[in-house]
UniProtKB/Swiss-Prot annotation:
Its main location: cytoplasm. This is Ribosomal protein uS12 methylthiotransferase RimO. Catalyzes the methylthiolation of an aspartic acid residue of ribosomal protein uS12. SUPFAM superfamilies: Radical SAM enzymes (SSF102114). It comes from Campylobacter jejuni subsp. doylei (strain ATCC BAA-1458 / RM4099 / 269.97). Its cofactor is [4Fe-4S] cluster. Pfam families: Radical_SAM, UPF0004. GO terms for biological process: tRNA modification. Residues 2-114 form the MTTase N-terminal domain. It catalyses: L-aspartate(89)-[ribosomal protein uS12]-hydrogen + (sulfur carrier)-SH + AH2 + 2 S-adenosyl-L-methionine = 3-methylsulfanyl-L-aspartate(89)-[ribosomal protein uS12]-hydrogen + (sulfur carrier)-H + 5'-deoxyadenosine + L-methionine + A + S-adenosyl-L-homocysteine + 2 H(+). The keyword Protein biosynthesis does not apply. PANTHER family: RIBOSOMAL PROTEIN S12 METHYLTHIOTRANSFERASE RIMO, RIBOSOMAL PROTEIN US12 METHYLTHIOTRANSFERASE RIMO. The gene is rimO. Keywords: 4Fe-4S, Cytoplasm, Iron, Iron-sulfur, Metal-binding, S-adenosyl-L-methionine, Transferase.
């Protein structure tokens, strides 16, 4: 049997596309060593400069490790965005494709030909997919593309405009995954709260929540990448009212200064953002994640200080911060740029604030009782079982270490009620109290 090595870079949306490719290539034996693979695939990220460099380095590194007569295939956002340049500059690569042909990857390899469709690939209920990384959790991509016009983001230039999956397609995939033992789902898109806007439906995500709740066997779900202008008060209240969707609110804000929100073309203001955030925060057991960009063109010292004060005071649970990356095909590209030294200085300042904010979030979990799902052996060694809070997204929000159990041996993928005993440098030590369900 021929062997396949696949490297998926970038976001969880890319991961879903990689899993689609694995589904099409199920005849191959997956391997962990590039040097033994007959086919090597890199699913690239082309979002910001650091991601582009990571993708190029990964391609060159795999070329160095590959065996003679193997095929090196490069796909994904970087290829879609820089197709002509990369095909000229990467003679190491055998086959190229972009973001439109994931379900034709088997055909492409068989015929040894490049493929570049004009449209972005959109998953259907007939798409074969092999879930990786978990036996209980899966990401569900509900749309592709984006209609927003943020000044710093090039994604619409290579992913295109919003294209939503049909609800029946999503429900069919969920039912199949539940039948295979999956019970925990994260719904993703570039802008999830705009789901079905392209079909003229303004409450599409609410309708999807209604349909998801009818499926027996789903234990938890969360929605990632809410966009401030497309996420309505009604949507937030519907999530809060749900018995399946946890009160996990992931909304990248990018800034809080009204001046910067206008420059960044975010379509909203700080007053509306704070009202929405306070509504989210009022939910029982709420968990708030966001992200900010520092050093965007036009950011004054006063704007930056306003951002720092807000991050320090609001009480987010998780915050990601990024240095502005100058990207072609964006409105900010031709604006007067903030000097690199200033950007780096600001990044270090806000990273310190964020570190303290996240530490407080972990600390407030001590003595709480939480539902967790066991995920495997801990990174801290054989004496701990790793778990995640059922509210959390997979991998990015933290790790719970269980070293005591009042309910016998713990099963992977099973849900338990745990008491949080201690915060160990952003890892929570816990004791399992009881098994929550028998599924």
């Amino acid at each position: 049997m021929s062997k396949l090595y696949l490297m998926s870079l970038g976001c969880n949306k890319n991961l879903v596309d990689s899993e689609i490719m694995l589904g099409r290539l199920s005849a191959y034996e997956l391997c962990d060593e590039p040097s033994k693979a007959d086919v090597l695939i890199v699913n690239t990220c082309g979002f910001i400069d650091s991601a582009k460099k990571e993708s190029i380095n990964a391609i060159l590194d795999l070329h160095e490790q590959r065996k003679k007569d193997s095929l090196l295939v490069v796909t994904g956002c970087l290829m879609q965005r820089y197709r002509e340049e990369l095909m000229k500059e990467l003679p190491e690569v055998d086959l190229f494709t972009g973001v439109g042909d994931y379900e034709r990857i088997d055909e492409m390899i068989l015929k040894k030909t490049n493929l570049f469709s004009n449209s972005t690939y959109l998953q259907s209920e007939n798409s074969k997919r092999i879930i990786t990384g978990s036996n209980s959790h899966a990401f569900i991509k509900i749309a592709e593309g984006c209609n927003q016009k943020c000044s710093f983001c090039a994604i619409p230039s290579f992913k295109g405009r919003l294209k939503s999956r049909q609800i029946n397609s999503i429900i069919a995939e969920l039912k199949d995954l539940v039948a295979r033992g999956y019970k925990d789902f994260s719904f993703i898109a570039q802008d999830t709260s705009s789901y079905l806007f392209d079909k003229g439906e303004k409450d599409g995500l609410i309708r999807l929540i209604d349909e998801v709740e009818k499926i027996k066997g789903i234990r938890a779900a969360r929605i990632l990448y809410l966009y401030p202008t497309s996420a309505s008060e009604a949507l937030i209240k519907r999530i809060i009212a749900s018995e399946i969707f946890v009160n996990y609110f992931d909304m990248p804000l990018q800034h809080i200064s009204d001046n910067m929100l206008k420059i960044m073309k975010r379509g909203t203001n700080s007053t509306r953002l704070k009202e929405m955030l306070n509504l989210m925060k009022s939910a029982p057991n709420s968990f708030l994640r966001t992200g900010f960009i520092v050093g965007h063109p036009g950011e004054s010292e006063a704007d930056f200080e306003k951002l720092c004060e807000f991050v320090k005071d609001f009480g987010f649970d998780r915050v990601s911060v990024f240095a502005y990356s100058k990207e072609e095909d964006t409105a900010a590209f031709d604006m007067e740029q903030v000097p690199f030294k200033v950007i780096n200085k600001r990044l270090k300042i806000i990273e310190k604030i964020v570190d303290e904010v996240i530490e407080k979030s972990f600390e407030k979990e001590v003595e709480q009782k939480r539902l967790v799902v066991c995920t495997g052996e801990s990174s801290e060694g054989e004496f701990f079982i790793a778990a995640k809070d059922l509210r959390w997204d997979r991998e990015i929000d933290g790790e719970i270490l269980i070293n005591e159990s009042e309910c016998g041996n713990l099963e992977m993928g099973q849900i338990y009620e745990c008491e949080i005993l201690q915060n160990l440098d952003k890892k929570l030590l816990a004791k399992a109290l009881r098994k929550v369900d028998a599924n």
